[in-house]
Amino acid sequence: DGVQDTHNLGACIRSAEGAGVQAVVVPRHKSARVTETVVRVSCGGAEHLPVVAVGNMARFLSKIREDYGVKVVGTADQSDAELYEVNMTGPLAIVLGAEGEGMRRLTRENCDQLISIPMAGHVDCLNVSNAAAVCLFESVRQRLMLELGVFEP
């Protein structure tokens, strides 16, 4: 929701493509655009993964929840649960906030659940592209474990 830095957006797209997601959705306004830098940093991810700009992120999240049964999980410092406590095996949208500011209020209100990534050191949060990778690959891990029959949501 409003990632401004093109290097961060490119890294998010790279992780998303590697995790097998269907699309990356960004706000049409107040967000980095797909530029030559984004394409380069994504290491090919931007060439294989649709990056869709929407005019109203909150409305988009509401629509995919209602029309397609997508669970919307947002990352936030103040959260309902930690990442590893959340079932991420079904249809899922992971929402990450802008650098420094986090998610906008209406975007936050359209999340089914807010999650945080547990931090063991002295820093209190990760860079948005690192947070994206951690969340995406936790979902991949859960789905693989479910396929193997060793994970029960």
Model regions and ranges:
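Post-transcriptional modification and biogenesis factors for structured RNAs
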Residues: 1-153
